[in-house]
Amino acid sequence: MIERYFVTEIGKIWSDENKYNTWAKVELLVCEGWAQIGLIPPTDIEKIKTNLTVNLPRMLELEAETKHDVVAFTRMLSETLGPEKKWI
């Protein structure tokens, strides 16, 4: 964003941190939907809810390595989970 047009509140909306936190919320909602129809066991969805964490520095590091934002994102989320990461 061009600095002279920067408004703090708008800048936060378009920040990488907000973008990846929103993506994580979507992932969690999808997992919750799958759990409701029985595709994800209740124990796994609870672990996902508890442990799903966005780590922006790690995300950017993985993105630099993979050259792909979605691959980096799913890897970053998976690092915060155990075997239940298969649902991400």
Swiss-Prot record:
EC number: 4.3.2.2
Species this chain originates from: Spiroplasma citri
Catalysed reactions, as listed in the record: N(6)-(1,2-dicarboxyethyl)-AMP = fumarate + AMP; (2S)-2-[5-amino-1-(5-phospho-beta-D-ribosyl)imidazole-4-carboxamido]succinate = 5-amino-1-(5-phospho-beta-D-ribosyl)imidazole-4-carboxamide + fumarate
UniProt GO BP: 'de novo' AMP biosynthetic process; 'de novo' IMP biosynthetic process
Pathway: Purine metabolism; AMP biosynthesis via de novo pathway; AMP from IMP: step 2/2; Purine metabolism; IMP biosynthesis via de novo pathway; 5-amino-1-(5-phospho-D-ribosyl)imidazole-4-carboxamide from 5-amino-1-(5-phospho-D-ribosyl)imidazole-4-carboxylate: step 2/2
Name of the protein this chain belongs to: Adenylosuccinate lyase
PANTHER family from the UniProt entry: ADENYLOSUCCINATE LYASE
A GO MF term: (S)-2-(5-amino-1-(5-phospho-D-ribosyl)imidazole-4-carboxamido) succinate lyase (fumarate-forming) activity
Subunit structure: Homotetramer and homodimer. Residues from neighboring subunits contribute catalytic and substrate-binding residues to each active site.
Family (UniProt): Belongs to the lyase 1 family. Adenylosuccinate lyase subfamily.
The gene coding this protein: purB
Superkingdom per UniProt: Bacteria
